Amino acid sequence: VVPFEQNREIRFSEETREDIIRACFAMGKVKTGALIVVEQAIRLTEYESTGIQMDCLVSSQVLINIFEHNTPLHDGAIIVRGDRIVSATCYLPLSDNMGISKDLGTRHRAAVGMSEVSDALVITVSEETGAVSVAQGGELTRSINEAELRVKLEEVQHKSSETNRIKAMWKGWRKHAKKNN
């Protein structure tokens, strides 16, 4: 990474957005589980380092290939930064939120957990049902359709990084304040 690019606002292209959508719903049709973390303002370096480092343009074919059963990279999450997949097989923090439905597994708990500690948008594809869900800000929106996923990704795509940083700091402060009360 070039030092002067560190603070550059990184957003993904429409092509990346559409490839993510296409891959998620293709995997859903054949019930291939997936966990895709779309990084925003907060760098996910700590979680990125738990996986296998990659530097690959996002494409629906690559995403589908990564999560294919019995392949070396299918377990864990991938992290997307801008238009690139930067890491695969990443471990994410699990949510300890007791309000999460008991019928949801580790993948969904990890999605919510990651969204509790960062400003990332986390997309899951259920291996059991094929349903696509999104976690953001500690909330899980289950069984969304292609249009709804497109709206969520467009919101992320067009947010300013300064707004994201302020919201993340506020959320972190609130969570810390709740634990100390």
How would you describe each model-predicted region?
Residues V1-N181:
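Divalent-cation
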